[in-house]
Regions:
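N-terminal Rossmann-like NAD(P)+-binding domain of SDR-like oxidoreductases, especially those catalyzing
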Residues: 1-102, 124, 146, 156
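Generic alpha-helical secondary structure signal
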Residues: 9, 115-119, 176
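Aromatic/hydrophobic pocket-lining residues that form π-stacking "cages" and hydrophobic walls in ligand
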Residues: 40, 83, 120, 151, ...
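Glycine-rich "substrate-gating" loop/helix at the edge of Rossmann-like oxidoreductase active sites
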Residues: 69-72, 100-114, 134-145, 168-170
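Alpha-helical substrate-binding/gating segment
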Residues: 102, 118-131, 142-165, 171
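PAPS/PAP-binding and catalytic site of the sulfotransferase fold
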Residues: 173-179
Length: 179
C-alpha cells in the first residue's frame, strides 16, 4: 500500500442531525451545520477535493417549503444553495445524497439523538409501551443502512454534481411503524 499525498474525495456526513433538538441546541446546530460545513467546503475547494455531502429529507417536504421549519432544515438547505453556487463560481465537484430515516444495526436507541426506529426497538426490548406522538398519522420514509452505504458508494463513483435520494418508495405512518 503506497500512501497517496492527494486526497481525491471527502465524505461529509458529520453534521448536527435532529430537527427537534436543533431548537433546543441552536448554537450547536448552527456551529456544526453552517460554520463547520463551510470550513469543510473551503478545504475541499482549496485542495480540489470532490465532496460527497449528506443532505436531509427534512428540507424536501411540501415541495421544499419545509426548509424553513427548523434550524436544522434551514442550515442544511443553505448549505445546498452554497454548493450550487460553488459549482457555478469555481466548478466545484460534489455529489449530494438525501437521507431518509436510516435504520439498521447499531442505530441510536436512546437519548436525544435516538431515531424513531431505535426508540421503538428499545421500548419493545424493554417491554415498555411504544411512545407515539399523536396523532401518529404523520408519515416517514425509511432506508436500511446497507442500502444507504450502497448508494453512497455509487454516488461517489459518479462525477455528475447530482442529487440522490435514498428511501423506500412507500411512506409509513408512525402508527404503522409501531405495529
Amino acid at each position: 500500500f503506497k500512501y497517496r499525498k492527494r486526497i481525491h474525495s471527502l465524505f461529509h456526513f458529520g453534521e448536527f442531525a435532529r430537527i427537534y433538538q436543533s431548537f433546543k441546541n441552536f448554537d450547536k446546530c448552527f456551529k456544526s451545520n453552517s460554520l463547520g460545513t463551510q470550513a469543510v467546503f473551503k478545504f475541499c475547494l482549496d485542495n480540489k477535493i470532490k465532496l460527497i455531502y449528506s443532505a436531509t429529507s427534512a428540507s424536501l417536504g411540501n415541495k421544499g417549503e419545509d426548509k424553513n421549519l427548523s434550524p436544522y432544515a434551514f442550515t442544511k438547505s443553505k448549505n445546498l444553495e452554497l454548493l450550487e453556487n460553488l459549482k457555478k463560481w469555481f466548478n466545484f465537484k460534489y455529489e449530494v445524497i438525501y437521507f431518509f430515516n436510516v435504520y439498521g444495526p447499531r442505530h441510536i436507541r436512546s437519548g436525544e439523538m435516538a431515531t424513531v426506529i431505535g426508540i421503538f426497538e428499545d421500548q419493545y426490548i424493554n417491554n415498555k409501551s411504544l411512545t407515539i406522538v399523536q396523532p401518529g398519522t404523520q408519515t416517514r420514509k425509511f432506508t436500511h443502512i446497507q442500502d444507504t452505504v450502497k448508494v453512497c458508494y455509487e454516488a461517489w463513483l459518479k462525477n455528475k454534481c447530482a442529487h440522490y435520494g435514498i428511501s423506500h418508495k412507500k411512506s409509513y405512518s408512525i402508527y404503522q411503524v409501531a405495529k
